[in-house]
Every structure is written in C-alpha cells, then in structure tokens.
C-alpha cells in the first residue's frame, strides 16, 4: 500500500503535513523509495482489553539515495490514544554529516517533541561554528513559543546536538496551535537546512569514514537496545512484532 493512500496522508492524522513535507522534499533530491517488507509497510491491529478494543494503524516508509543517503525512514502510528511520527535519515558515511532525527509522539495526556541534527561523532568533529550558530538560532526561535522540556540524562544527551528542539506539551487546543504553526515551521527549516548541507557535503578521507561508520553503529545499537518507544509499541502490536520492527527495520541500514 502506498503511504499516500493511507490514513497518514489525511487531515485527521495529526502529523500529515509533516509527513507530506518529508516525502515531497526527499523526492526533489531524486531519492528512491525503498521497498519495506509488507508486514512492516502497513499494519492494522487492535489493542486494549476485550471490552474496549481499539484500532491502531502503522505504516513504515523509506527511501535511499545512490550517493548521499543509506536509509531514510518514517514510522507512522495512528490510534485513539497515540499518534506518532518517527523519522530518521542515516547519511552515507563518505560524508561527515549527522543524522536527522524526528520524534513527534502524542500520548494520552501529552505531546513529546524532539527534532535535531543528531551527532554520530563528537560535536566539534562534525559541526562547524556556522552550522551550530544557525541551528541554535532556529532552536531558540522555536523555544520562544514552545516550552523546553526537562533536561535529558547524560546517557541520552550525548546523542543530541546543542540545536535540539525538545518540548513537552499538554493535550490542549493551545498545543495543537503551536504544533500546526511554530513546530511545523521549525521542522521545515531544520529539514531544508539538513538536506542542503547533506547534498553539498564533500567526500571525506577513509580514516574519517571509519570513524563515521563506528559512530553510526554505536548510535543504532544504542537505539536497538534502549529505544524508548519499545513499551508503547509492545502494548500496541505485541512484543514479537515490536522486536523485529526495531531490529530489522527501524535501526538498520
């Protein structure tokens, strides 16, 4: 099933505009859709007690680029209690470019929002001052409207840049307005800047490529072992499906 034919392209899914912007902009850079195994590309399921079963939909969509992107994938979830857009670009390791990471999660009582250029090396080895200044300026503008969430633990924070947008909003009308306006604007600014940098980057030497491979593998292994979405996914789709999704699709190249 094409992602365009699913509920995730319809206005009643909270993140539909974000997903459309991703798909359209990656196509402008001649990215090619990557075939996802059918059991992960679209899934309908139910969760909850026998007396109050709820429907949940999941779709996984991905692309590659012959030179620049190993794998870029979006995971979309829709249900009465949860609405999720998780997106990750894993760049080719011949370029010294961080990951692009999005995690927008609507829970029963709150929205958790993360947007960043996520490092695969130490910050000083992957970001020049110009990029950091641009990111921090965009971040500060976003957080002039969106509250900054509590400080991340050191173990988690090492996988984020100084430009990370990290917010927690209550489920209320004001939050819907902030998501549809300020967050959407910031999301477009971050993605546009990221793709510009990725597609203008020059190839690096073999030693640095090895460091980038190790850095990416460290992050992907950390996510496989510690993915915070695991409990939610397990409650919606069961443990067996969740483990195979995480290990075979979400954090692999």
Swiss-Prot record:
GO biological process: phytochromobilin biosynthetic process
Pfam families xref list: Fe_bilin_red
Top EC class of this enzyme: oxidoreductase
Lineage: Bacteria, Bacillati, Cyanobacteriota, Cyanophyceae, Synechococcales
InterPro entries with a match to the protein in the record: Ferredoxin-dep_bilin_Rdtase, Phycoerythrobilin_Fdx_Rdtase
Reactions the enzyme catalyzes: (3Z)-phycoerythrobilin + oxidized 2[4Fe-4S]-[ferredoxin] = 15,16-dihydrobiliverdin + reduced 2[4Fe-4S]-[ferredoxin] + 2 H(+)
Biological function: Catalyzes the two-electron reduction of the C2 and C3(1) diene system of 15,16-dihydrobiliverdin.
Molecular-function GO terms, alphabetical: cobalt ion binding; phycoerythrobilin:ferredoxin oxidoreductase activity
Keyword Oxidoreductase: yes
Protein keywords: Oxidoreductase
Signal peptide annotation: none
Record's keyword annotation contains Oxidoreductase: yes
Protein name per UniProt: Phycoerythrobilin:ferredoxin oxidoreductase
Family designation: Belongs to the HY2 family.
EC number: 1.3.7.3
Top-level taxonomic group: Bacteria
């Amino acid at each position: 099933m094409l992602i365009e034919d699913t509920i995730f392209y319809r206005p009643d899914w909270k993140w539909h505009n974000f997903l459309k912007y991703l798909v359209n902009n990656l196509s402008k850079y001649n990215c090619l859709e990557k075939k996802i195994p059918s059991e992960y590309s679209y899934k309908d399921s139910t969760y909850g007690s026998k007396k109050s079963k709820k429907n949940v939909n999941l779709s996984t969509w991905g692309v590659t680029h012959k030179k620049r992107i190993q794998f870029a994938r979006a995971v979309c979830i829709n249900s009465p209690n949860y609405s999720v857009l998780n997106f990750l670009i894993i760049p080719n390791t011949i370029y010294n470019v961080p990951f692009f990471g999005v995690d927008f999660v609507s829970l029963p009582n709150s929205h958790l929002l993360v947007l960043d250029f996520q490092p695969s090396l130490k910050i000083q080895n992957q970001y020049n001052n110009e990029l950091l200044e641009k990111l921090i300026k965009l971040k500060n503008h976003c957080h002039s409207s969106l509250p900054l969430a509590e400080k991340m633990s050191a173990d988690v924070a090492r996988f984020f840049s100084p430009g990370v947008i990290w917010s927690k909003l209550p489920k209320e009308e004001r939050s819907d307005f902030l998501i549809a306006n300020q967050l959407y604007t910031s999301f477009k600014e971050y993605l546009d800047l990221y793709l510009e940098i990725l597609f203008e980057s020059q190839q690096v030497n073999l030693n640095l490529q090895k460091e980038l491979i190790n850095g990416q593998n460290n992050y992907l292994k950390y996510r496989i072992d510690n993915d915070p979405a695991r409990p939610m996914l397990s409650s919606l789709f069961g443990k067996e499906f969740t483990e195979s999704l995480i290990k075979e699709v979400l954090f692999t190249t």
